[in-house]
Amino acid sequence: MEQSSLLLKKQLADMRRVPVDGFSAGLVDDNDIYKWEVLVIGPPDTLYEGGFFKAILDFPRDYPQKPPKMKFISEIWHPNIDKEGNVCISILHDPGDDKWGYERPEERWLPVHTVETILLSVISMLTDPNFESPANVDAAKMQRENYAEFKKKVAQCVRRSQEE
Amino acid sequence: MATESALIKVHVKSPSNKYDVEIAADASVSELKDKVLVFVPTANKEQVCIIYTGKILKDEETLTQHKIADGHTVHLVIRNQARPTPAPAAATPTASSAPSSNPTPSSQPNPTNNPFAAMGGMGSPADILNNPDAMRSVMDNPITQQLLGNPEFMRTIIQSNPQFQALIERNPEVGHILNDPNVMRQTMEMIRNPNMFQEMMRNHDQAIRNLQGIPGGEAALERLYNDVQEPLLNSATNSLSGNPFASLRGDQSSEPRVDRAGQENNEALPNPWASNANQATNNQSNNRSADFNSLLDSPGISSLMEQMMSNPSMQASMFSPEVINSIRQNMSNNPGLIDSIVGQIPSARDNPQISEGIRRSFPQMLNMMSDPSVMEAMRNPRVSEAFRQIQEGFSTLRREAPQLLNLFQAGAMGGGAFGSDANASSAGANSANGLADLFNSMNMGGGRPSSTAAPVNPEQTYASQLEQLQSMGFSDRARNVAALTATFGDLNAAVERLLNSP
């Protein structure tokens, strides 16, 4: 069996025993170690507090050389999450140099990252959006220009996530 | 009878706090929420949200279902009460608490304790049992499914039924079956799904037909019949008429009920004694001898051996002095018996030399068997193992080289059935000696490769695997070495092992 699946199995077992604050992770299907189901708990003292946002982590076979893809299934309104739910953070970008020069190589994917470090980054992203490279331009614009509307929109998502 | 299942400790982690909750291992999520509410008095139950492995747990699910075990941590989120809470779902908690509150439903024949009473408007129980459609709809009812999905509860029902209790007391092996949650689940699944039910029945019949076809199948059926079917049917027909829920119903009316499962089974498992007893021409005077007559008549003595090897207690009873003595008496009282045995062996029938050899060796074997030291040897588990290997080798031979088998067949009946005795006493005909050599070489080949394959220095042998384990974050070198040694260097198995051990 490949190293990737062994590594993921270890992470899964660790997480079952000692889960990390702020999210809960498991497999979508017990037979597929490469597809993880994550429930991100809206961080306290943010607009997202009280929400549970479901996401799928899709690991490539050559993990940890390459990063997984993360996609929110629950509707979530955030500058760094595009409208399809794809999460856009630097540590999930393929390793190497950024062709636009925004990100330094050490900010991008590194094989040391685990589900835990990825999710912690995502949670901190929910707390502090990065306006430099918005994936959802409308959300970024709304947050800057019409914060009240932005708040309302996020609250809507939080409410919807609770109903699931 | 364990009505109280073990308590486990579950850590509940909220964004701001951490609580420890003690709860039954098979409790429902709803029960867990009740316990959590003690710590969070401000919240009401609808606001409590338990999350585990990426999923929001639903009230009616159980902890076992999500594999939440002792020491595991679940997340707790209290929803904000911005929106109007929906009307409290009253039905679920009552249903889920039923198993624990009614540990002995049948001891108090009270309609309110009947779990099926919850399903009103279903018609009377007798109607349901007579009508497969109604039965199915009962089985499809979520309340029933929940009840039946709980093996602990099913066990309680069964164990509190006096007929079943008696049955289990007499036949511990049946008790094991009823204690096996998998078997229970399968049975329930089967009842629920008519197609599966029919399929199972068909498979069952087919399997038995196949069994009868292979040499020795009869012997296996006989044992099955004696050990399971007969006591089951006996106890069932006594008063239960095959319906384990009979005593659960408040009314104990004695109207006859149709039980499809019982009847089908009855047909599917033919009573081997019946046919053989008719064939047995003499010695009807003594029950035991009749048994042995038919047993020895069966062409499948070798398969009987197989059965015995896998069942030490049966083996012990087979070789108990009384049994051996009774065989001997039987033999001396009835000289025709050996002839009839020999007549059952095709190659012996055609070859007077072989049949003569068997005839001569039989009394000697029996003498040997009454020797305590031989009996001791027969009970030795390693000897049993050797027997098993012989049997295995033989079946391989049958598969791979049937032409070879014909050569040995006569010896096999004499030597195979009572293998080691034939070898030791050289009582068998000459052909048995060749067979003994063959067995010896087979035993050698199928010996214990594991003992020779043990590496001298595991750290050296598994250096590359050790390195990989290290790189995956398994830092305890001693444990890594132990795991690799135990798995013979299989990295995947070693990781599995390391992860599963705390």
Curated annotation (Swiss-Prot), chain A:
Signal peptide: none annotated. GO terms for molecular function: ATP binding; ubiquitin conjugating enzyme activity. GO terms for biological process: proteasome-mediated ubiquitin-dependent protein catabolic process; protein polyubiquitination. Pathway: Protein modification; protein ubiquitination. The active site is at residue 88. Residues 3-163 form the UBC core domain. Keywords: ATP-binding, Nucleotide-binding, Transferase, Ubl conjugation pathway. It comes from the Eukaryota. SUPFAM superfamilies: UBC-like. It is an enzyme of class 2 (transferase). Belongs to the ubiquitin-conjugating enzyme family. Catalyzes the covalent attachment of ubiquitin to other proteins. This is Probable ubiquitin-conjugating enzyme E2 7. It comes from Caenorhabditis elegans.
Curated annotation (Swiss-Prot), chain B:
CDD domains: UBA_PLICs, Ubl_Dsk2p_like. Residues 84-115, 274-290 have a biased composition (Low complexity). Residues 84-136, 235-294 are annotated as: Disordered. Induction: Induced upon ER stress. Residues 124-157, 161-200, 289-327, 351-387 form the STI1 domain. GO terms for biological process: ERAD pathway; negative regulation of double-strand break repair via homologous recombination; nucleotide-excision repair; proteasome-mediated ubiquitin-dependent protein catabolic process; protein export from nucleus; ubiquitin-dependent protein catabolic process. One of its GO terms (molecular function) is polyubiquitin modification-dependent protein binding. Residues 235-251 have a biased composition (Polar residues). Keywords: DNA damage, DNA repair, Repeat. Disruption phenotype: RNAi-mediated knockdown causes a reduction in lifespan. Induces ER stress characterized by the expression of hsp-4, the accumulation of ubiquitinated proteins and an increase in ubxn-4 expression. Mutants display increased homologous recombination repair in response to DNA damage compared to wild-type worms. Worms lacking both POST (F36D4.5) and ubql-1 have a shorter lifespan and display an accumulation of ubiquitinated proteins in the nucleus. Residues 252-262 have a biased composition (Basic and acidic residues). Residues 455-501 form the UBA domain. This is Ubiquilin. It comes from Caenorhabditis elegans.
